[in-house]
Amino acid sequence: MTLPLLSVSSDRAVDVEADALVVAVSSEKEGLRVHAPEGLEFDADGLSDIGVTGGRDEVVRIAGTGTAARTIAFVGVGSGPVDAVALRYAVGSATRQLRGVAHVAVAVPVSSLVDLTAVLEGAALGTYSFDAYRRDSLAGQKPRATAVTVLAQGDSWTADDADEAVAHATAVAGAVAGTKDLVNTPPLDLYPATFVDAVHERTAGLPVDVRVWDEVALAADGFGGILGVGQGSTRPPRLVKVAYSPAGATRHLALVGKGITYDTGGISLKPAVPMIGMKYDMTGAATILEVVVAAARLELPVRLTAWLCIAENMPSGSAIRPDDVLRMRGGTTVEVLNTDAEGRLVMADGIVAASEEHPDAIVDIATLTGAQVVALGERYSAVMGEDALVARLLDAAREQGESMWGMPLPEEMRALLNSDIADIANVKPGNPAGGMLVAGVFLKEFVGRTGDEDDAPRIPWAHVDIAGPSHNKGGGHGFTGKGPTGVAVRTLLALAAGFSRA
């Protein structure tokens, strides 16, 4: 993970020496609008003649004649408002597509500190690449930018504010890139024990506490879901607790993440083609790890606890079978009718463990169901759970420009999970209807109460299914290239920041 060096300058765009100067262009009813920085003028009709439309993800380069820059790159911001979300997307699209430019200067309309931070984030996010396994790290392509300078003048922020914006953007982009790096790592190299190593590496020097349950401790403490899923592999499972508890924090947000380092489906084996890409099944755990890392770097005044539920789901003579019963943390028994519905089993243990600390809220995140992709496609995450918490998550996602959609948890679906011999079954075999919702209903069963009393209310809880948007299988868009997306990192950070102000 290498991020570009970010900086903010009040210099005039025309005077800045850079390999590329990024200028924003809008598509409006009246025609093309060039958001020209001070000291520069552009002929909108002339730009239209060479194919500039102002559409999103459009980047057109011309010679930097009349400026100190080598080239000028016009990036489209679309036809909507030129706000923080649009600017983050557009600038990220520019840095993702610009190659062979070591230093990029960005001169887009920045009217607030929020805009400035978003532009810095987008610039850093767009430069991501993963080349750890390539002989030629560039794969024949020119390198991306190593330095980005945002040119902005404003009366609403100080130099210290600009420095904080740079620090914030660096932490956020680092968290997204860290998530992508983990998800990109092949399962031969990333398995439960090495995932734990990565946790220690990412948290080194930060004010966080890490506790690890190995297979012996998991058995002693009754984590039957994580143990059951992992028992078919020669590489035993782990549960990792990463706790950030700053002095003075009055609110506690717990995060639970699915960390299946490879999902073959177990005895309920996946077909060959759908199995490709199942290294992505640990995205939830990687996401919450990086959220805590970023929160600690930013010194957010909120207590965060991440529960990484890590296992490898493999078929073998020791693997769990359909018809087996697992006893979960807390004592609930689960009849396993499909071993490929394993994510909910490890997550249930994590939710119970998180509940035992009586946090103010629990959010779990997982690449949980193929049904999520069927329902919402490959760019929208599903959110379900307690209404107020779901609303806060959706607001945070909207603020960050991440696509999430609220879904119901119908009470009548609980009956579909009735078991003849256990407290609950993990699936309803042969009934694909509402599969994403059924998984959410299953997880809800394990959410604890706000206190030790039997009649205490349930802890506010939300479930985020990122099965589709965790992986971009097509071409790049905005600051997101092909491969893992780091979806929900920014939303969960924004949610945590909101908790710190509550």
Curated annotation (Swiss-Prot):
Q: Which residues bind Mn(2+) 1?
A: D263, D340, E342
Example of a GO MF term: metalloaminopeptidase activity
- Supply the enzyme class, top level: hydrolase
Q: Which residues form the active site?
A: K270, R344
For this protein, the record's SUPFAM superfamilies field holds: Macro domain-like, Zn-dependent exopeptidases
One Pfam annotation reads: Peptidase_M17
Biological process terms in GO annotation: proteolysis
A cellular component term from Gene Ontology for this protein is:
cytoplasm
Keywords recorded for this protein, A-Z: Aminopeptidase, Cytoplasm, Hydrolase, Manganese, Metal-binding, Protease
Q: Where located?
A: Cytoplasm
Catalytic activity of the protein: Release of an N-terminal amino acid, Xaa-|-Yaa-, in which Xaa is preferably Leu, but may be other amino acids including Pro although not Arg or Lys, and Yaa may be Pro. Amino acid amides and methyl esters are also readily hydrolyzed, but rates on arylamides are exceedingly low; Release of an N-terminal amino acid, preferentially leucine, but not glutamic or aspartic acids
Q: Does Cytoplasm count among this protein's keywords?
A: yes
Q: Which cofactor does it need?
A: Mn(2+)
Where does the UniProt entry say this protein principally localizes?
cytoplasm
Q: Which residues bind Mn(2+) 2?
A: K258, D263, D281, E342
Q: What does the record say about how the cofactor binds? A: Binds 2 manganese ions per subunit.
- EC number, as in UniProt: 3.4.11.1, 3.4.11.10
Q: What does this protein do?
A: Presumably involved in the processing and regular turnover of intracellular proteins. Catalyzes the removal of unsubstituted N-terminal amino acids from various peptides.
Q: Which family does it belong to?
A: Belongs to the peptidase M17 family.
Q: What is this protein called?
A: Probable cytosol aminopeptidase
The organism is Clavibacter michiganensis subsp. michiganensis (strain NCPPB 382)
What is the name of the gene encoding this protein?
Answer: pepA
